[in-house]
Amino acid sequence: MGMDQTVKSRITRIQLALENNEWLKAFHLAESGISDEPAILPFRYLMIDALIQGGRFDEAAKKITLWRKDWPKDRKLGIYALHLHVYFKKFDEAERLGETLLEGAQNIVEKRDITLHLAFAAHGKGNPRGAILLLNDLLSEDPLNTDAYETIGKIYFENARFEEAERYLLALTDIDPLHPRVHQLLGLLYSEQGKWDEAIMELEEAVEIEPSDETMRELGWTLNMVGDKDGAISVLEEALDMNPLNLQARIDLGTIFMDQENYERALAEWKIAQTQDPGNTAIKSNMEKAREKVEKDRTISRH
């Protein structure tokens, strides 16, 4: 039996709220829909979507667990559960559920989604070969699946198989040149191999597509590695403007100031870093070295 026009209208309002990233509004609209029409499952799906968009993953998982008791055969709730098992690194549970869901996959889109998350679970369990087999099976059916290319590239990178990683990541750039993560991954891959110019080019591309403090940090440190200290400082300061709590960016900036013999600036950065991570012995050691240099410079200047 189809939904009446009022229900469809309410669902559309929730979907629009989600499209506008108004997750709390979407949540309350879905909550109202569930209260008025408890048998209409799309209201529950949209509530889960709202909770996930708002980063309330624990609450989403609780709702899914509760509702699957009432609708144990509902495949969409099962797929939500699979996604969250992977998110929470419950890889054994994800594999069991995923294999069950895969047996009854009702369409190609559903099959691809389940296969992808089974691959994530295999990777999480330390079975890279199994993950790659699943992902290559997925690519044989869906040769434009960007998630599969990205994940295979990451797995090969993690296992120091750089040529294979590069091949899959470059294939991903052919499919989607504006993919938000592929240029960052290529930048890290080239950095790991000491190919600094290539790394800088890819990281600059990543920053242009989707700026983030972590990508800026990676670019800043790579600029430092080719001797562009001023460029590195500028980029790292920009990363810290975006996120003052990026601890590694703060440490990197202090290190570069130390290399430049700008000991007071180095000490200032590491003091801030220590407030973020008081037990970090490396930061403490760096602070002591910088403080000694500052005191030495002051002693010399007094004489």
Predicted regions span which residues?
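Conserved structural position within tetratricopeptide repeats
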Residues: 32-35, 65-69, 103-106, 136-140, ...
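Canonical tetratricopeptide repeat
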Residues: 46, 80, 114-117, 151, ...
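Register position in tetratricopeptide repeats
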Residues: 19, 53, 87, 124, ...
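Helix-start (N-cap) detector for alpha-helical repeat units in TPR-like alpha-solenoids
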Residues: 7, 41-42, 75-76, 108-112, ...
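Short coil turns that delineate tetratricopeptide repeat
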Residues: 38, 72, 106-109, 143, ...
